[in-house]
């Protein structure tokens, strides 16, 4: 009878320990639409910060409201090797066109782990 109680206590303690151990996520964030971009900022296309670069590309202000968020001054983020997953500004997943990295359309900010 005593051994059954000991077994039950040990089993319960093991289950609690397994639940209490934190799990770490070591997966690299990924972007299904292309490379992760490291941008100086991600702004609404209608913001004053994006107005200048978009105007330089010939995007009319009325059309800017259709673009959503844009990445400004972006470069592809390396996920392998030296400096992997390091972006000192804003990492973003972008679905639209890239204009020499100055402006990237259709961006959403992401958090690097």
Curated annotation (Swiss-Prot):
Residue stretches in coiled coil: none
Location in the cell: Secreted; Secreted, Cell wall
InterPro entries given in the database record: Hydrophobin
GO cellular component, one term: fungal-type cell wall
Broad class of where this protein is predominantly found: secreted
Tissue: Expressed in the fruiting bodies but not in vegetative mycelium.
Name recorded for this polypeptide: Class I hydrophobin POH1
Organism of provenance: Pleurotus ostreatus (Oyster mushroom)
Gene name tied to this protein: POH1
